[in-house]
Amino acid sequence: MITRPALARILASARERNAAVGAFNVILLEHAEAIASGAEQAGAPVVLQISENCVRYHRGLAPIALASLEIAKRAKVEVLVHLDHIEDQDLVREGVDLGVDSVMYDGSRLSYDENVRTTREIADLCHAAGIAVEAELGEVGGKDGVHAPGARTDPAEAAAFVKATGVDALAVAVGTSHAMVSRTASVDRALVSRLRDAVGVPLVLHGSSGLSDDELRGAVESGMTKINISTHLNGLFTRSLKAFLDERPDVVDPRKYVRLGRAAVEEETARLLRLLAA
């Protein structure tokens, strides 16, 4: 009997309930700890995301991936480890060998035909190992530091891409941009509904830090199933540290202030997961 990949299973369950799964990026070990603890507070599954930038920061995938996998294993709720925006196919293979739960392969910089070909190869590789695959058709706004809220995914092209590649989830451009520090973006809800009707797999919203709570709920109600958030949580983490050090510049033990960032991310993770599941 073939077991359905964990990410595909929890996304399908959320899609049936018109809810969404939160996927939050790991930067430091404390992020993984905070996100898993926040998920336990909310009683909801969560996805720990590791990007190529994170891999470069930690000078390799194994240190942060293995630590995240151990945190996930010890959690009292379902916590998955996911590789986010991976362009390096060798890194995908390393992730498969390490035992990650899912991969977002990003071939959006390639030509359409090459994107389809390489995404199909990655999907076949990962599915053989019981790992789910997310992909992207064309760039979501904000790549290379350029916000492009006008970018939109065509439903017919999205449906054809999913059929050709066999991916389990699709990241779509519906008005958000990566790395936004203000929550002022808006989602094209009508387009989300059209994409949900056209595409037979769960839809993924990248760049969700730029959305208010109302916009997040609207995106979920319109058909988004996986909500990626990073910058918003990083801002909370950083502001917590800065506030402490502004008052106590004499403190040199990093545990005394890094734990405040961890606590802030934990609290907001729990709140966001409850919002997405409402």
Place the predicted regions along the sequence by residue.
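Alpha/beta enzyme core
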Residues: P5-R17, L29-C54, L61-E78, I86-A198, ...
